């Protein structure tokens, strides 16, 4: 079978994927040292670094792009873990702080005596048939826990910000 001329040209024009660059330990040490100082080195710093570690400036530039992406990914994961652990501890505190007395049911006299001006008027009512799901309670606990988490983060942030007198 013979190939048509157009298919032969297309095969020759197809770009070869470049091989993955493998960095040796001294190159990685030098790259990481510069990354500790700045996540965005300028062209002169990249060129000098490339010359010192025997890489092209383009490879150094791509390494920094990838390293910044890794840094952001690790930072997000760390924040997510910290938030999850704080949320877990707050939800455990919320469970401890729950009142021992049962909440009033829809038909209890306490519930019927609440007026629309009551501060509890925005709390969702529980149905008399007992169909109020555990999910509502969980959502309320999560909501309270997330509000406590936000308040704690806010107060921590306020304590870290220097005041100007």
UniProtKB/Swiss-Prot annotation:
One of its GO terms (cellular component) is nucleus. It comes from the Eukaryota. May play a role in development of the heart. Keywords: Developmental protein, DNA-binding, Homeobox, Nucleus. It comes from Gallus gallus (Chicken). Disulfide bonds: none annotated. This is Paired mesoderm homeobox protein 2. The keyword Nucleus applies. Residues 1-24 are annotated as: Disordered. A motif (OAR) lies at residues 142-155. Its main location: nucleus.
């Amino acid at each position: 079978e013979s190939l048509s001329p157009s298919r032969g040209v297309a095969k020759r024009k197809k770009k070869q994927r470049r091989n993955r660059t493998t960095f040796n330990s001294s190159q990685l040490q030098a790259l990481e040292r510069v990354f500790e100082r700045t996540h965005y080195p300028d062209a002169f710093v990249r060129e000098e670094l490339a010359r010192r570690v025997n890489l092209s400036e383009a490879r150094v530039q791509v390494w920094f792009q990838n390293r910044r992406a890794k840094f952001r990914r690790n930072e997000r994961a760390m924040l997510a873990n910290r938030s999850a652990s704080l949320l877990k501890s707050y939800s455990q505190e919320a469970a401890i702080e729950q009142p021992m007395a049962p909440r009033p049911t829809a038909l209890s006299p306490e519930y019927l005596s609440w007026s629309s001006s009551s501060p509890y008027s925005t709390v969702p009512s529980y149905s008399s048939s007992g169909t109020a799901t555990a999910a509502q309670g969980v959502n309320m606990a999560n909501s309270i826990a997330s509000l406590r988490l936000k308040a704690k983060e806010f107060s921590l942030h306020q304590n870290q910000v220097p005041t100007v007198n």
